[in-house]
Amino acid sequence: MADQDQTNQQAGSDAPSFNLQRVYLKDLSLEMPNAPHVFLEQEAPQVEVSINVGGQRLAETVFESTVTVTVTTRVNDKVLYLVEGTQAGIFELANIPAEQMDPLLGIVCPTMLYPYLRANVADAITRTSLPALHLAEVNFQALYEQRLAEMAQQQPDAANGNDSGIILPPGATRQ
């Protein structure tokens, strides 16, 4: 009976697990370089948004995933405000097959973090007394696939049959 319990525990320890351990605001900055003059502007602002996903391994099964957004709003070529924020999370990924790690870190983790980042950015902008800006939903799977396509285009060696798996930096050549 004790042997069966030990076998069940060992089998359970080999089971794949994906756990969110912590979500935190890693960085948030807001600049209004042309205040208070921008409050007098009557024209509609132009909004530029860029999003980036990153991450790093913290321990064997522990990873930090980040989503960074930069929002630049201009009126008549003057910056109304600039908001930069990074939302981060610590995730434990144990016994996950290698081919599933990158999609989990590049799609699932950012998808979980993004709502927190949206709320933090919206709150920061609201505190400027300007109209709120609510960031649109992001399809992180499409961004991930786009990144893979860009990497494939930068990898002419892979298309020529060199499947070493080594990703070269731009401009580097294989010896």
Curated annotation (Swiss-Prot):
InterPro entries per the UniProt record, alphabetical: SecB, SecB-like_sf
Coiled coil: none
Pfam families assigned to the protein according to its UniProt record, in alphabetical order: SecB
Residues spanning the signal sequence: none
Record's GO cellular component terms: cytoplasm
Membrane among keywords: no
Keyword Protein transport applies: yes
Residues covered by region (Disordered): 153-175
Record GO biological process: protein folding; protein tetramerization; protein transport
SUPFAM superfamilies from the UniProt entry: SecB-like
Biological role stated in the UniProt entry: One of the proteins required for the normal export of preproteins out of the cell cytoplasm. It is a molecular chaperone that binds to a subset of precursor proteins, maintaining them in a translocation-competent state. It also specifically binds to its receptor SecA.
Subunit text: Homotetramer, a dimer of dimers. One homotetramer interacts with 1 SecA dimer.
Name of the molecule in the record: Protein-export protein SecB
Gene name for this UniProt entry: secB
